[in-house]
């Protein structure tokens, strides 16, 4: 999920916007920092039954976005082992991209789930914390992204679920709320309607790739509606370098694991 928002955030320094068009408040000093809370049975401050109901619907929406293909999407990029598509939505926008990797779906997902390594391939992350795990397949993670120019930093508070869709590995994320984890002063909380990763086996190609990865997100980044179209298209152009970073760190991780 992080990579989609990271690319959206990276477009802020390219978008010009007057102060009159933006309603972001100036950052204020705030000593409060989100503290890590881990409880295997429940996570303090969150309503698990409500989250479970919400994620059930989100998984269905995720599956629909995966299965609908790219009809109606704008093609943002299509070369060098990476295809990027985007479309406007009634709320926010949808970004979808695919690329292939020379590792199995299980190996790829294992690497992407290692929170401690995310900053090695996503330089836009300022801070990331696991708030807690309900079990090995369900977690809540807080992520804060770096500020760009006059734009306030973005942050997400997301519930993540590892599951199977169409018989393939997937990780689906949605935004959650908690009074214990309010939006920090000087930051804008991004709303994730649904986001995630989907990894499926493919016939090995000439480069040794054997998994097709699809990453998608439907989000509201807290931008004025007039800027969504510009943001989604520019964000799409920043994705290919990110996928290359992921592949580089993925290879490094498994090479070092053999030592």
Each language-model region and where it sits:
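Eukaryotic helix-grip
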Residues: 2-259
């Amino acid at each position: 999920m992080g990579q989609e928002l990271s690319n959206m955030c990276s477009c802020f320094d390219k978008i010009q916007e007057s102060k009159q068009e933006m309603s972001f408040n100036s950052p204020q000093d705030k000593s409060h920092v989100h503290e890590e809370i881990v409880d295997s049975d429940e996570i303090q401050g969150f309503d698990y039954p409500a989250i479970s109901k919400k994620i059930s619907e989100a998984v269905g929406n995720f599956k629909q976005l995966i299965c609908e293909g790219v009809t109606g999407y704008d093609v943002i990029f299509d070369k060098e082992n990476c295809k990027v598509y985007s479309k406007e939505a009634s709320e926010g926008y949808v970004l979808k991209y695919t690329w292939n990797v020379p590792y199995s779906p299980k190996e790829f997902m294992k690497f992407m789930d290692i929170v401690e390594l995310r900053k090695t391939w996503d330089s836009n992350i300022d801070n990331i914390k696991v708030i807690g795990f309900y079990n090995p397949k369900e977690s809540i993670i807080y992520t804060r992204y770096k500020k760009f120019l006059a734009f306030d930093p973005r942050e997400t508070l997301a519930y993540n679920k590892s599951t199977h869709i169409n018989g393939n590995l997937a990780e689906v994320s949605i935004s959650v709320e908690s009074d214990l984890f309010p939006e920090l002063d000087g930051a804008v909380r991004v709303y994730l309607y649904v986001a995630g990763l989907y990894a499926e086996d493919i016939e090995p190609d000439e480069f040794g790739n054997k998994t097709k990865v699809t990453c998608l997100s439907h989000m509201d980044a807290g931008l004025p509606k007039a800027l969504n179209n510009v943001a989604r298209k520019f964000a799409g152009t920043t994705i290919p370098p990110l996928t290359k970073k992921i592949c580089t760190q993925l290879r490094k991780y498994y090479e070092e694991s053999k030592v």
